[in-house]
Amino acid sequence: MYFYHRIRDLREDHDKTQREIAKYLNMQVTVYQRYERGEREIPIWAVIRLACYYQVSLDYLVGLTDCIKPYPMYSWI
């Protein structure tokens, strides 16, 4: 599965619109739409914010694993 499929699927699973996610990422909707279509590379800061928002690991977002659970949070971080 491609990365852009993951971000679209997560958004749809959480019943969010592209406009809502674009606002969360502080970007124009058209820019976010290009990320979801795979027409533009998404910056790492946006990937990290999406992982936090959806509470999934970065590995899941980029397709390295199918395990949707996030990494445990450590108090020393």
Model-predicted regions and their roles:
Residues 5-24, 49, 75-76:
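Short basic helix-loop element that most often maps to the first helix and adjoining turn
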Residues 7, 21-22, 32-35, 61:
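Conserved hydrophobic/aromatic packing and binding residues within compact polymer-binding modules
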Residues 26-41:
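Recognition helix of helix-turn-helix/homeodomain-like DNA-binding domains
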Residues 38, 49, 67:
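Alpha-helical DNA-recognition elements
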Residues 45-60:
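DNA major-groove recognition helix of helix-turn-helix/homeodomain DNA-binding modules
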Residues 62-77:
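Short, charged recognition helix plus adjacent turn
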